[in-house]
Amino acid sequence: MVRRLIIGISGASGFQYGVKALELLRAQDIETHLVVSKGAEMARASETAYARDEVYALADFVHPIGNIGACIASGTFKTDGMLVAPCSMRTLASVVHGFGDNLLTRAADVVLKERRRLVLMVRETPLNLAHLDNMKRVTEMGGVVFPPVPAMYRKPQTADDIVAHSVAHALSLFGIDTPDSAEWQGMAD
């Protein structure tokens, strides 16, 4: 079976996380299925210099957010799972409560029901009780809550270094190794 990963980009700040995932997966020759929310399109335009077509060209397949009949909306379409990078609190809440009202949340619902890996790079601070409850619930459902917290021990030099390490770590949860996912070797004596 070809390795396939669904990449969801939702409307939280941090559109770059989704782009970096697509870049790293292209280098690994893993088939990517991209779905981008309307809020994510707004974040792309306000936070980055990326053109929409430039981002979409990184994916093997791009599915419109409203296409509930897309292949990734069915459990019979085999994937390694789904990475939502970044994941807004609205998307998290929709996944937890089973609202498959758009293709991003429907695909996440399918990944959970098929017992595949769902990794949510949640982006919000500070967190309120509803956020924390939803994170707990999605974890109980089998999802992985993965806030993209900078790994300062790696001594990042740029924002891209921080993004690359977080995304590489998230991809390692799918068994995908990238050059940015080097193992921690411990502290020097």
Curated annotation (Swiss-Prot):
Record bears the keyword Oxidoreductase: no
GO MF annotations in UniProt: carboxy-lyase activity; flavin prenyltransferase activity
Keywords of the record: Flavoprotein, FMN, Prenyltransferase, Transferase
Top-rank EC class of the record's enzyme: transferase
InterPro entries: Flavin_trans-like, Flavoprotein, UbiX-like
Superkingdom of origin: Bacteria
Known catalytic reactions: dimethylallyl phosphate + FMNH2 = prenylated FMNH2 + phosphate
Enzyme Commission code: 2.5.1.129
Positions with a binding annotation for FMN: G11, A12, S13, S37, S88, M89, R90, T91, R123
Residues reported to bind dimethylallyl phosphate: Y153
Pfam families, A to Z: Flavoprotein
UniProt entry tagged with the keyword Flavoprotein: yes
Family the entry assigns: Belongs to the UbiX/PAD1 family.
Functional description taken from the UniProt entry: Flavin prenyltransferase that catalyzes the synthesis of the prenylated FMN cofactor (prenyl-FMN) for 4-hydroxy-3-polyprenylbenzoic acid decarboxylase UbiD. The prenyltransferase is metal-independent and links a dimethylallyl moiety from dimethylallyl monophosphate (DMAP) to the flavin N5 and C6 atoms of FMN.
Name of the molecule in the record: Flavin prenyltransferase UbiX
The species this protein was found in: Neisseria meningitidis serogroup A / serotype 4A (strain DSM 15465 / Z2491)
Lineage: Bacteria, Pseudomonadati, Pseudomonadota, Betaproteobacteria, Neisseriales
